Amino acid sequence: MYSEADRTLWHGRIHDNDNHAHFTNSQLVQVVDAEGELTERFDVGILGYAVDRGVYLNQGRVGTKQGPDAIRTKFGNLPLMHDLSIADFGNVTTEEKFVEDVQHEYAELIDKTNDYAKFHLLIGGGHDISYAHFKGLKALYPEQSIGVINIDAHFDLRDSEYGTSGTGFKQILDEDADAGYLVLGLQEAGNTQHLFEVAEQYDVKYVLAEDIDYDTTDEIIQSFIEQYDIIMLTLCLDVIDSAFAPGVSAPCSFGLTPQQVERLIRAVLSYGKTRHLSIAEMNPEYDIDGRTAKLVGHIMFFAVHRNPSIL
């Protein structure tokens, strides 16, 4: 079910009402009804996946359906470093038992809003957003190959009769034989032996969290990206150490730092093959003083302000 964004979420400190050099994001965001006729084009589009049913079905900690709105409040208070236009295209939600219908709806909105923003921030919500993200890209680029880069502690290659937050990438690989899959920041202790066997079966590439460095990891990213026309980039916040990101569905004790994650995102975006970044598993129910939501706001800030697709 679609709902237009709540304009009151976009608030923050007002330094000046006229000089854009003093503006925060909240002062320039335009709330747009994505179900209506779209005419104006923006630099950045935001689309929320306010769904945690997939997390529940994956036996995780629910609460991520509140994630998109919590993220908006923190991103809105950050400075606007370039004269950019930002559209908030609203949220999808669901009260249904399963997530397939809301994933389909979200994919359709990705398709519809694509031409009306240079770069899209897809904010969740459970990591079942990944399958919806991919379906949206396939609708946009049916004849082009898609490589999926997932910055995540987990493979999310589980098998189930219905979609969950842990099945998205297996669904993608089962449906598209031409798709490739690279996981960055994987936790060896966060995946069963069976999941490693499934990853080998599907020829999944991965870099363990302990092996993330700049030179070697950049080479792996480059080698992967060069094989595909389009790169789908998705971030699961449980890849970040729980000292920095307590407000997630599955907190991680040996996770990456925010700086490492930002550096990985920047490396992927530098190739110009990525126009959508999905961010999953922000769970305000377990956040501390808005720490995780603010971290996501900063990740979005850098994804926008260090992005060759926009600037």
Swiss-Prot record:
Textual note on the cofactor: Binds 2 manganese ions per subunit.
Pfam families membership: Arginase
Cofactors that this protein relies on: Mn(2+)
GO molecular function terms attached to this record: agmatinase activity; formimidoylglutamase activity; manganese ion binding
Reactions it catalyzes: N-formimidoyl-L-glutamate + H2O = formamide + L-glutamate
UniProt binding sites for Mn(2+) 1: 127, 152, 156, 236
Residues reported to bind Mn(2+) 2: 152, 154, 236, 238
Pathway the protein acts in: Amino-acid degradation; L-histidine degradation into L-glutamate; L-glutamate from N-formimidoyl-L-glutamate (hydrolase route): step 1/1
InterPro entries assigned: HutG (IPR005923), Ureohydrolase (IPR006035), Ureohydrolase_dom_sf (IPR023696)
EC number: 3.5.3.8
GO biological process, one term: L-histidine catabolic process to glutamate and formate
HAMAP family: Formimidoylglutam (MF_00737)
Family label: Belongs to the arginase family.
The protein, known as: Formimidoylglutamase
